[in-house]
Amino acid sequence: MRKALFAAIALVCLAIAIVPASTTRAAAPAATEWAANTTVIEACSCPMFCQCYFNTSPAGHHDHAGAAAHFCRANLAHRINKGHYGAVSLDGVKFWVASDLGGDFSGNPPKMDWAVLTFDKAMTKEQRDAVGEIMSHVFPVQWGSFTTAEGSIDVWEYTKDAARATLDGGKSGEVKLKRFQGMTNDPIVIKNLGYWGVPRHEGFVLMPNEVEAYRVGPKAFEFKGSNGFMITWDMSSKDLAPKPAPAKN
């Protein structure tokens, strides 16, 4: 994800990669092979374009008393276009991540406030387990709180000009985006900018939000006119650094 976050992730991956192999270690058991090509309808509370991609803290927000607080509260509505985890098909699976990155994610690993991963009701237990494992690699950070929930992602749609997703008909969550007008009628796309822990993506398609809301529990929030975009990323188990084999006794 963010610039500092990418650097921290890179250091962690490098440290794993350079651990010397030992002749006293047995071969590690084969991990489950997986792959996912996923499109995300995403929005957050930062002004357009989210400064978190270039800094170690989010934009400041002022309350009615004038006090400033830094946070990035976001909704990420995912749909796996094509994917699998071992023999488990993930084609068409939808899930939702609501989160707050907190005020400072300069650590290594980056520490962020909270996240809720909501599985669509149509998902099987095997699909939920698979998505949970894959997301741990997509979001390689330390959350202060990470929980799961279940809901109905009943709207997930987009065109060249707009995108919309709702959780429980909008009662639990909603993201509505509209394309920002560029020099032509084609979408504005930012490429070659890192996104969380994924190694490949097709670019940030800029679409400021008309609304982005998470309407569940004490951490509910709602913003209008702030950052939004769509992105399609691709990742597989082949992209992960191999884990060192356990030492023999």
Placement of each model-derived feature along the sequence:
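Short amphipathic beta-strand and strand-loop transition segments with alternating hydrophobic
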Residues: P58, A98-G102, S152-E157
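Short acidic, gly/pro-rich beta-turn/loop elements at beta-sheet edges
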Residues: F54-T56, V88, Q127
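Mature, soluble, non-transmembrane domains
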Residues: N108-K243, K248
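Mid-chain, structured segments of secreted extracytoplasmic proteins
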Residues: K82-A122
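N-terminal segment immediately downstream of the Sec signal-peptide cleavage site
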Residues: A28-H84
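Bacterial N-terminal signal peptides
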Residues: A7-V19
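Positively charged n-region of N-terminal signal peptides that target proteins for export
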Residues: M1-A4
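Sec/Tat signal peptide C-region and signal peptidase I cleavage site
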Residues: I18-A30
